[in-house]
A protein has these predicted regions:
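Extended, helix-rich architectural segments
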Residues: 1-242, 250-253, 258-261, 372-374, ...
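Catalytic nucleotidyl-transfer cores of nucleotide-processing enzymes
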Residues: 239-342
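C-terminal anchoring/interaction modules
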Residues: 1-42, 97, 112, 120-121, ...
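Alpha-helix initiation and N-capping motif
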Residues: 85-89, 102, 106, 173, ...
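Short low-complexity stretches enriched in small and charged residues
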Residues: 72-80, 280, 335, 382-386
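Short, flexible segments with low predicted structural confidence
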Residues: 63, 84, 278-279, 351-353, ...
Length: 585
């Protein structure tokens, strides 16, 4: 079991920070290259003529996250838990819009492509509540944790195997003391001994460059989740409590008056949340035997630096370029004429010898520099997956086959990055769904879409499902293309395709009732990025029409049978003779 004494836990935190900082050694350099020399007082000596980081982010982020995600929820127990799955689905889709989780995901997308991203999911009081109602509603919320403040077990071989995760936070000391008066779990005596601004150098806040602020009397502390520790007073996993949260801060008097290196500023408390913990980590590429992923930008930064070095060298050569004209020093008038006459002016010189006027060029870019820059740029584009077609720079020199091959290779890489990001988003929404499913303090209206689907005038989501329902029985899937950007032309084309599909399918539905048209339309809607395609067909109206047609057919058959049975023997013989006469008997 992990030693969770304050001093040992703080030493674990320091070790985790050192390991994290080794992966973020060039983080600030990448940011400086991304924003350029005109942003925020960045040193002009760090200027990158080939701003690959900006280009990669501007081309990739809109393809990864552009809109709020939508989810579909199914269950392994469709008979008994089908209604629960439908309620969680409407609750999650309403929650993504109400909290605008897209804004958090966009910031985390930049972190993911530069280094790695982290989201903290926790329960918070709902905004806009009536204090006189007597009921305090909660719902989950997501927060971006900067890579500079996140910590994870440095000896873990992967994120699920880590024995602890956590993050640094900064708050006003006065606010903590006020909260300690209300909440006895805070250790007021320890908070009073904390020195303000101690540890701020590791908080991710970089002073200077116009960010020098006066003393704010802030303190630095850490929240650490240890999943393997269960407190005696914890209700246990059966009631939604998994692991323990420790809040620790450095001891100012360590080594002088107190042998403890740190102390708990809050009593350890059971963690109420999903068994996967409060943190969700985003990354692009897996690196064996380390919890930190590899970002596509960090993987190519060596080639970016090399390309920029050669471009700077070529730029310096171009700046040193000179074009001189050498003349015979004996002819003063010739030298003056060459110097003073304007461009393209004809200067008549009697008895001019061509050897007396010699043009001379010094410096400038060489062919070798141009060739190597082009080779380095092509290598960077090849490894990063960026090509001219993505940039919109199609000159026509490449064939359609070459453009198609380049687009296919880039699509494979981008599709993998999108898949990794979407899987991390699904994990975040799974944590949100856990709170919606288990916490009875979650109450909020679902809106018009849910009202139409559920057939209720004003449906509300109410958390804390039936005890027989288990969240592990639910399966969450992101709707295809729900987070991606689509162009106006693509939307128009999809609308026309949807119209044609509905027109063809609607006419075939009554004739082939044995086909699962709803499932077929759902699959076609996923391919067209129109997840609600099946809702365009009113299945209840279709059933009514089919039943009406069947009833009409049965009524006609019954009327014909009644007419036959009502005929007298003479009428029956007369009808038979009439039929026989028609066929010539």
């Amino acid at each position: 079991m992990l030693d969770i004494t304050p001093t040992n836990l703080y030493e674990e935190i320091e070790s985790a920070e050192r390991y994290r900082d080794s992966h973020l050694e060039h983080y600030n350099d990448v940011i400086s290259g991304y924003v350029g020399p005109m942003y925020g007082g960045v040193d002009r000596d760090q200027f990158s003529p080939e701003n690959h980081v900006y280009e990669y982010l501007s081309l990739t982020v809109p393809r990864v996250i552009h809109d709020n995600p939508r989810v579909r929820v199914s269950t392994r127990r469709p008979v008994s838990q089908g209604a629960v799955a439908k309620a969680i689905e409407h609750g999650l889709n309403r929650w993504t819009r109400d909290t605008n989780v897209r804004s958090v995901l966009q910031r985390v997308a930049y972190d993911t492509l530069i280094s790695y991203g982290v989201i903290l999911t926790t329960q918070v009081p709902m905004p806009g509540q009536d204090p006189m109602s007597g009921f305090k509603a909660y719902w989950p919320n997501c927060y971006r944790i900067t890579p500079k403040r996140f910590i994870i077990d440095p000896v873990a071989l992967s994120v699920p195997e880590s024995r602890f995760t956590g993050h640094m936070w900064v708050r006003d000391k006065e606010d903590l003391l006020e909260e300690a008066k209300i909440d006895p779990s805070w250790n007021k005596e320890v908070i009073e001994t904390l020195t303000t601004s101690q540890g701020m150098e590791d908080s991710g806040f970089e002073k200077g460059r116009g960010r020098d602020v006066p003393e704010r009397h802030e303190v630095v502390a850490y929240d650490v989740w240890v999943p393997e520790i269960e407190l005696k007073e914890s209700p246990g996993p059966d009631f939604g409590f998994h692991g323990t949260i420790y809040t620790v801060a450095a001891n100012e008097y360590y080594g002088e008056k107190d042998p403890s290196k740190a102390d708990f500023i809050r009593e350890p408390r059971p963690y109420y949340g999903p068994p996967t913990g409060p943190y969700s980590m985003f990354g692009a590429y897996y690196v064996p035997d380390t919890p930190y992923p590899l970002s596509p930008i960090m993987a190519t930064m060596g080639q970016v630096d090399e390309l920029n070095d050669h471009v700077r060298s070529a730029s310096a050569s171009a700046a040193n370029y000179k074009r001189l004209i050498l003349v015979d020093s004996k002819s003063k008038k010739l030298a003056q004429d060459v110097k003073s006459q304007p461009h393209d002016y004809v200067v008549p010189v009697e008895g001019l010898d061509r050897d007396r006027v010699i043009p001379l060029e010094l410096g400038g870019i060489t062919n070798q520099q141009v060739a190597y820059i082009e080779m380095a740029r092509e290598r960077l584009d090849r490894n990063s997956g960026i090509h001219d077609a993505m940039r919109g720079n199609v000159t026509g020199s490449a064939t359609a086959t070459e453009v198609s091959i380049a687009e296919g290779s880039s699509s494979v890489r981008l599709a993998y990055i999108k898949q990794q990001f979407q899987e991390a988003v699904r994990n975040v929404l799974s944590k949100v769904g856990w709170y919606l499913h288990n916490d009875d303090r979650v109450v909020f209206p679902l809106g018009a879409e849910a009202a139409q689907d559920l057939g209720l005038p004003e449906p509300y989501f109410m958390g804390g499902m039936d005890p027989s329902s288990r969240f592990s029985d639910l399966e969450l899937e992101l709707e295809a293309y729900s987070m991606e950007r689509t162009t106006e032309a693509l939307q128009q084309r999809r609308a026309m395709e949807a119209f044609q599909i509905i027109a063809n399918v609607a006419s075939a539905m009554p004739q082939m009732p044995y086909v699962d048209w709803g499932g077929l339309l759902d699959k076609m809607g996923d391919a067209l990025n129109m997840p609600d395609l099946s809702s365009l067909v009113d299945s209840q109206m279709l059933q009514q029409m089919m039943q009406q047609q069947q009833q009409e057919a049965q009524a006609q058959q019954q009327m014909a049978a009644e007419q036959v049975s009502a005929q007298t023997p003479e009428e029956e013989m007369a009808s038979e003779r009439a039929v026989a006469g028609q066929i010539g008997i």
